[in-house]
Amino acid sequence: MSIGSFVRFDRRYGLVIFALGIWIWIGYSIYAHTSKKIIKATIIQSSKPVRHIDDRIYPQKKETLWFDTLYFPKGNELRHPKYGYLGYRQNFVAFFDTDIDVPKDEFVNFVIYSDDGFRLTIDKQKIMEYPKDRPFQKSEKVVRLAKGKHHIHIKYFQGYGQLGIVGYYAVGMSAKEAQKARKYLIGKSSSDLKFLEH
């Protein structure tokens, strides 16, 4: 084998390794940014102002997306850290739906930070709400859930200005224990509560 053929072989080998590296990187990027179907989000843009959780919506655009967590931090546009900016800034509602499996009867503390308002229901029963405009603030409620499967539905609205909604939960054998327990993002399973993938 001459030096020239060795150099050609080396370049080809290098190109194959480079192409393989790019292929692996693209595959990982797609996998890392593919949403687990944990939380179904239906977002409706209204052509008229929204100032209250029960205001009539005049649909201008409707979109259904899937997310792994209820984490849309405070900002000027609806954004998820994993999936980026979603193009919603004002006058919209979002419906978040997910199912959970509770392994035993337990108390669950739900903590919702929102700007503007929201309503949380479990199995069609209203648990807590803040129905009007507000800056990014916290609402908290402890509920007792029986062993088994439950459906969580969160309605969120944004009027104008800053926006965001972030949800956490914590589990305990008593209400007081649930308030002090470690908090997890809604959508992230723990040993005490499992979010079901669709």
Annotate each predicted stretch with a short phrase:
Residues 3-103, 113-198:
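Extracellular/secretory pathway-exposed regions associated with glycan biology
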